[in-house]
Amino acid sequence: MAREFSRADRVAQELQKEIAIILQREVKDPRIGMVTVSDVEISRDLAYAKVFVTFLFDSDESAVERGLEGLNKASGYIRTLVGKAMRLRIVPELRFVYDQSLVEGMRMSNLVTNVIRKDQERYVEEE
């Protein structure tokens, strides 16, 4: 019977949980601040993982850059802690990337809201 999710998907999901816990409890770099792991994409051979993150201070681009720099500098340490927490033959090499999807989703939502508001104003003026 075929599984609903591949092994890579299951490992990515577990990796997301472990990295979130590690970032919350273990990493003390002040550049990182409040970070959320939104998604993890892992290669089929489980050797590389792209970790998508968002920050509490999304509006400040320089703070986001500093946060990503801190995360990528700490990726070796995080990888070591992940290796201790998960039983994997090969612990994936971690690369942290800022997740633009939430910002883009909010921008699209604001555009739709503005169009609806303008349409309602125009409808009221016509009556």
Swiss-Prot record:
One cellular component term (GO) for this entry is: cytosol
Biological process, per Gene Ontology: maturation of SSU-rRNA
The keyword Cytoplasm is assigned to this record: yes
Keyword Glycoprotein appears in the UniProt entry: no
Q: Which InterPro entries match?
A: KH_dom-like_a/b (IPR015946), RbfA (IPR000238), RbfA_dom_sf (IPR023799), Ribosome-bd_factorA_CS (IPR020053)
Main subcellular localization, coarse class? cytoplasm
MF terms in GO:
ribosomal small subunit binding
User: How does this protein assemble?
Assistant: Monomer. Binds 30S ribosomal subunits, but not 50S ribosomal subunits or 70S ribosomes.
Q: What is the name of this protein?
A: Ribosome-binding factor A
Species: Glaesserella parasuis serovar 5 (strain SH0165) (Haemophilus parasuis)
